[in-house]
A protein has these predicted regions:
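Glycine-rich phosphate/diphosphate-binding loop of Rossmann-like nucleotide-binding domains
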Residues: 220
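Extended catalytic-interface subdomain
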Residues: 265-272
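Short glycine/proline- and charge-enriched loop/turn segments
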Residues: 126-128, 177-180, 227-235, 319-323, ...
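C-terminal non-catalytic regions of proteins with extracellular/luminal or membrane-system context
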Residues: 1-18, 55, 156, 285, ...
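N-terminal beta-rich core of secreted/periplasmic extracellular enzymes
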Residues: 2-216, 248-263, 281-351, 367-388, ...
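Binuclear metal-dependent hydrolase catalytic cores centered on His/Asp/Glu-rich metal-binding motifs
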Residues: 224-246
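Histidine/acidic-residue-rich catalytic or RNA/ligand-binding cores of hydrolases
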Residues: 116-117, 226-227, 272-278, 282, ...
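Conserved, charged catalytic cores of large soluble enzymes
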Residues: 377, 384-409
Length: 604
């Protein structure tokens, strides 16, 4: 390796903290500050390094002029071209400034939900149920295997940091982010996050690992009225049930398992007392009591604290406003918000790309270089732990692994084995809520009416027919939500009422009067199924499944072993009367947490 930062070389046998400090000491102040930023970028093929991005400056400016070395990947090219594009950016980073390589991160990419601020629909990698579906299966070995699959796919693509797992508890039924959690039970989530981190990072963080960013500390989920804190109307996080500590349980497990990084949530705690002290009502990342006092000192976390994205600067993205999520400090200027974040104990600013803000604070004497060095050292240490400074290509991927990845199916980085595992897990996660005797499994020869399922998914023996010719119907519906589209990302968030529109209910009831109906509901949130549960012949929940996986579960080709990872409320009135911070506390739920019609409500 060449460059003022990395030469003369420091022996890999030297203590990793000493190596990190030595490298930081060799860097200019501007290069150190560049490490403290983690913006999102869009990457095409071929990569256009000189074109301005919809999110800000060109890639060349970010890498060369601003010295940024951590990037979250938003839109990317087809997987066959990702590696080449990222290698081009690595070469640019290696030729300038600190010569440190880039750490590319990503939101989840292995499931169904496409939300540019939270997750990406699987494309070229194996497709699994949403994490809530893994929570429904409840198999630690499978979750560990899933982590290993994600690790292999990311490494093959050149991605070395995951902005997941999300281990918030699904305690407010209306909240939009439940599908990416493991469910409402604290201990269950803790077991699964341990297994996931073992798969993603390995026993110890090292050259074979993907660095995990566990989120959203100290637990999203207790949102007032279930509204999402990406938006001003959802900024308040409340604890009327006094269950703050429940939400820490999975984070304690993640810290014990060695998570590389932790991301605080956007939410602003309201009326929260902790150990006899009133917690300041500002967004979690701005809160020194919770980041330094709780996370660093009480819980002993010494990894990277990466803020959630967009806490400092207002933005307009694709023509939609996206105000900074600076809840409780909206009155502060961007530079004052940056100072608050570093005072709180944050190491890196997610979604921000302007190091001049920190450089100005240094010039003013409002942040000293020792504070910058502490965070920069953590970020260099992470690169060292991942082996990025010990590989000639700077991303820690062995050639053999890259060659193996090229052997996947056409258009896929994943192996056929991984693809099959993901599809099978989609079926396994499905949860039978009710079934009349003799309905399931569906037989091999049927005249069936399919609604919102592709006819191509039907088995060879089925005749897909119009309703008047059918002996049974299989219907898919998604969980209800209220469409909104004022702010960027708002249209991607399923929020509001969990009750189905009467036209949906009436349509299913009318069909059920003519023939038995097997109703499959995608439970991205805990839908109110009370008007339908006694009407249909079988009621089944899925947590992210393709049509073929749905049919495989309904025909018994794969056994649907899922149990509800959250309860299904009986009514919206019951939801409104519940406490947002308390797991599974709606009055007289239609189905309790852990329920399956094939085994009651006791999780095995």
């Amino acid at each position: 390796m060449t460059g003022t930062t990395l030469s003369p070389a420091i022996s890999s046998s030297t203590d990793i903290d000493v190596r990190a400090r030595t490298i930081v000491e060799r860097m200019t102040v501007a290069e150190r500050v560049g490490l403290l930023f983690h913006p999102m970028i869009f990457v095409g093929s071929p990569v256009e390094v000189d074109q301005p991005s919809p999110l800000g400056p060109s890639l060349r400016e970010l890498i060369v002029e601003r010295g940024i070395r951590y990037f979250c990947l938003g839109a990317i090219p087809p997987v066959a071209h990702v590696r080449e594009a990222l290698d081009d950016l690595q070469a640019l980073a290696r030729s300038t400034g600190s010569r440190l390589p880039i750490v590319f991160s990503t939101d989840p990419r292995h499931s169904f939900v496409q939300n540019d601020g939270a997750s990406h629909r699987a494309d070229g990698v194996s497709q699994w149920p949403e994490p809530i579906g893994l929570g429904a299966i409840g198999d630690e070995d499978l979750v560990r295997r899933f982590g290993e699959v994600v690790r292999a796919d990311y490494r093959a693509l050149g991605i070395r940091m995951a902005l997941h797992p999300q281990i918030d508890l699904a305690t407010e039924p209306r909240w939009a982010r439940q599908a990416q959690s493991f469910g409402a039970d604290p201990e269950h989530s803790a077991r699964l996050v341990r297994a996931y981190l073992e798969g993603l990072q390995g026993a110890h963080l090292g050259p074979e690992s993907i660095a995990a960013t566990t989120k959203h500390f100290p637990g999203g989920g207790p949102q007032k009225d279930g509204e999402d804190p990406h938006f001003v109307y959802g900024r308040e996080q409340v604890y009327p049930g006094g269950r703050f500590e429940d939400h820490l349980v999975p984070f304690r497990a993640a810290i014990e398992a060695g998570t590389a990084a932790i991301m605080p949530y956007y939410g602003m705690p309201v009326g929260l007392d902790l150990h006899g002290e009133r917690i300041e009502e500002v967004g979690f990342a701005f809160n020194r009591q919770l980041i330094t006092g709780l996370l660093r000192e009480r819980l002993g976390f010494d990894g990277v604290v990466l803020s959630d994205f967009g806490l400092v600067t207002d933005a307009t993205v694709f023509g939609k406003p996206f105000p900074a999520r600076a809840w409780g400090v909206e009155h502060l200027s961007p530079i004052e918000r940056v100072r608050r974040l570093f005072d709180a104990g944050v190491d890196q600013l997610g979604g921000e790309n302007d190091p001049a803000l920190v450089l100005e604070l240094i010039d003013r004497g409002e942040i000293d270089t020792a504070r910058v060095d502490a965070s920069a050292t953590r970020l260099v240490r992470l690169q060292l732990q991942l082996g990025l400074l010990d590989e000639p290509d700077g991303d820690g991927r062995a050639k053999a692994e890259g060659d193996a990845a090229a052997g996947g199916a056409d258009g896929f980085v994943a192996s056929p084995e991984h693809i099959a595992l993901g599809i099978r897990a989609q079926s396994q996660a499905m949860t039978v809520l009710t079934e009349r005797e003799g309905i399931l499994p569906l037989g091999p020869e049927l005249r069936v009416h399919l609604r919102d399922l592709a006819p191509a998914a039907a088995p060879a023996g089925w005749q897909v027919v119009a309703p008047e010719d059918a002996e049974i119907a299989v219907v898919r519906v998604g969980a209800p939500f209220e469409p909104r589209d004022t702010y960027f990302l708002e249209s991607s968030m399923e929020q509001g009422s969990l009750a189905f529109d009467t036209t949906v209910v009436d349509g299913i009831r009318a069909l059920a009067e003519r023939m038995p109906v097997v109703l499959v509901v995608t439970l991205s949130r805990p839908a109110i199924l009370t008007p339908l549960a006694d009407t249909v012949a079988a009621l089944v929940g899925d947590f992210g499944a393709g049509d073929a996986a749905v049919i495989a579960a309904l025909t018994g080709e794969v056994e649907p072993v899922g149990r509800l990872p959250f309860e299904l409320p009986r009514s919206m009135d019951a939801v409104r009367r519940s406490s947002p911070d308390v797991p599974s506390d709606t009055e007289d739920p239609l189905f309790p947490i852990g329920w399956s019609a094939r085994g009651g409500s006791v999780r095995s």
